[in-house]
């Protein structure tokens, strides 16, 4: 560890990239505490003190914004609009042939898809900012009767929408700059920072409300979950590939053997985001349709509140688990293209020895991916995502469970990816030094 740090210090270029990354992350965190224009900050503090901002609508989004959502700051939307836009653009490759064509055009096509993602991020940010401003106008955003805006005029609402949308675009710009000029994937690092920022407050809340015994249990569960996630994320199925010998001029090429590494969790955390987004819709309906004057809500609102108002009901848990499994299978099926992989192998004289009994190469690849995804990957994601929900029901902690499976899954994945990129850059500079 100390040797690695010493090598980084002796590499000025890499050190500048790390300093640039940490600087933008620090600015991002400071922006989480800057109130948006037109927001009545004392009213926000009173509503937060009342403790009504709990539940599925808040916990997941607030986790990705590093607490900025409940502060109604300029970065309240966080990185979620960009994540949603990226997922939508990726899924549109299956529906729109033009998007698939752009994806295959490599650098030029990727630049066009990135531009589409930015436009969609702007549209989603405007939509979410308008929703937040409407809820803040009545106080329903934080579950209290106090309006969170200085006044309910259209101008004030418009200023809040502009401030929140601009904040989202600034966060997107931070992420792109980190990816281009810093270390690691910028968007992933911002998510990592937002999740990590909520850990101290979450753990402190567990100690205050549940005691040190429950705190020790939570830490133990978090450590075991982290070890399990590292093991699964680094696991892979290696499909052997053999290349036949070919005669090109006077040279004989090929004849080598390699493998296709297939990760156990190919979908990463995207199915969890899908499932959480779907199950946040009932919470949004509850917030919009719950009377603020204390009168009884409609029967269907009562029914939604009973089953989907929090994450500790068995119906919510079962539906959440099934959605994750379904989305995992769906996402892997549209992102992993066995036909394309098979064509690329045939173009260079490659084949899979084990595919002969199972038929064509693409059918064998589809068979292997289906087994890995459904038997291991989907169940693994479902179990990991269920950890905080089970904790809500068993130990009675709040919705802001600090060491939930989703948060640890994201942090471990981003951490491993960043460490690998730093190591790769260090090795690259080491070999460049030898060549000189």
From Swiss-Prot:
Gene3D superfamilies: SecY subunit domain. InterPro entries: SecY (IPR026593), SecY/SEC61-alpha (IPR002208), SecY_CS (IPR030659), SecY_dom_sf (IPR023201). SUPFAM superfamilies: Preprotein translocase SecY subunit. Keywords: Cell membrane, Membrane, Protein transport, Translocation, Transmembrane, Transmembrane helix, Transport. Its main location: membrane. The chain crosses the membrane at residues 18-38, 69-89, 116-138, 154-174, 187-207, 214-234, 266-286, 314-334, 375-395, 396-416. GO terms for biological process: intracellular protein transmembrane transport; protein targeting; protein transport by the Sec complex. It is found in: Cell membrane. The keyword Membrane applies. Component of the Sec protein translocase complex. Heterotrimer consisting of SecY, SecE and SecG subunits. The heterotrimers can form oligomers, although 1 heterotrimer is thought to be able to translocate proteins. Interacts with the ribosome. Interacts with SecDF, and other proteins may be involved. Interacts with SecA. Belongs to the SecY/SEC61-alpha family. The central subunit of the protein translocation channel SecYEG. Consists of two halves formed by TMs 1-5 and 6-10. These two domains form a lateral gate at the front which open onto the bilayer between TMs 2 and 7, and are clamped together by SecE at the back. The channel is closed by both a pore ring composed of hydrophobic SecY resides and a short helix (helix 2A) on the extracellular side of the membrane which forms a plug. The plug probably moves laterally to allow the channel to open. The ring and the pore may move independently. This is Protein translocase subunit SecY. It comes from Micrococcus luteus. The gene is secY.
């Amino acid at each position: 560890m100390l040797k690695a740090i010493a090598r980084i210090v002796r590499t000025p270029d890499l050190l500048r990239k790390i300093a640039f990354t940490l600087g933008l992350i620090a600015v991002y965190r400071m922006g989480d505490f800057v109130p948006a224009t037109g927001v009545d900050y004392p009213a926000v503090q009173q509503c937060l003190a009342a403790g009504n901002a709990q539940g599925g609508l808040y916990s997941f989004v607030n986790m990705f914004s590093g607490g900025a959502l409940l502060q109604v700051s300029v970065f309240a939307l966080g990185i979620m609009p960009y994540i949603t836009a990226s997922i939508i653009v990726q899924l549109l490759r299956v529906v729109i042939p033009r998007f698939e064509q752009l994806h295959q055009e490599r650098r030029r096509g990727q630049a066009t898809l990135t531009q589409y993602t930015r436009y969609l991020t702007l549209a989603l940010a405007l939509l979410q900012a308008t929703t937040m401003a409407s809820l803040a106008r009545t106080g329903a955003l934080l579950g209290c009767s106090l309006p969170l805006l200085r006044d309910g005029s259209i101008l004030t609402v418009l200023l809040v929408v502009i401030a929140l949308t601009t904040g989202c675009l600034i966060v997107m710009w931070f992420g792109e700059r980190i990816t281009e000029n810093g270390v690691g994937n910028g968007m992933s690092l911002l998510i990592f920072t937002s999740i990590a920022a909520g850990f101290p407050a979450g753990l402190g809340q567990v100690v205050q409300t549940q005691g040190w015994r429950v705190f020790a249990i939570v830490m133990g569960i978090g450590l075991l979950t982290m070890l399990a996630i590292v093991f699964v994320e680094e696991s892979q199925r290696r499909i052997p590939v053999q290349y036949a010998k070919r005669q090109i001029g006077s040279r004989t090429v090929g004849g080598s053997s390699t493998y296709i590494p297939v990760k156990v969790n190919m979908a990463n955390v995207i199915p969890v985001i899908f499932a959480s987004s779907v199950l946040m819709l009932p919470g949004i309906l509850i917030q919009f349709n719950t009377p603020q004057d204390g009168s009884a809500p409609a029967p269907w609102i009562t029914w939604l509140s009973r089953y989907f108002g929090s994450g500790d009901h068995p119906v919510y848990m079962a539906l959440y688990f099934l959605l994750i499994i379904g989305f995992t299978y769906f996402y892997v099926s549209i992102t992993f293209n066995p036909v394309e992989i098979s064509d690329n192998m045939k173009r260079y004289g490659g084949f899979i020895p084990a595919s002969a009994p199972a038929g064509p190469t693409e059918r064998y690849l589809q068979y292997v991916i289906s087994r890995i995804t459904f038997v291991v990957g989907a169940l693994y994601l479902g179990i990991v995502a269920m950890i905080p929900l089970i904790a809500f029901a068993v130990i009675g902690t709040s919705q802001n469970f600090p060491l939930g499976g989703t948060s640890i899954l994201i942090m471990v994945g981003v951490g491993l990816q960043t460490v690998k990129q730093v190591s790769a850059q260090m090795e690259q500079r080491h070999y460049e030094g030898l060549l000189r």
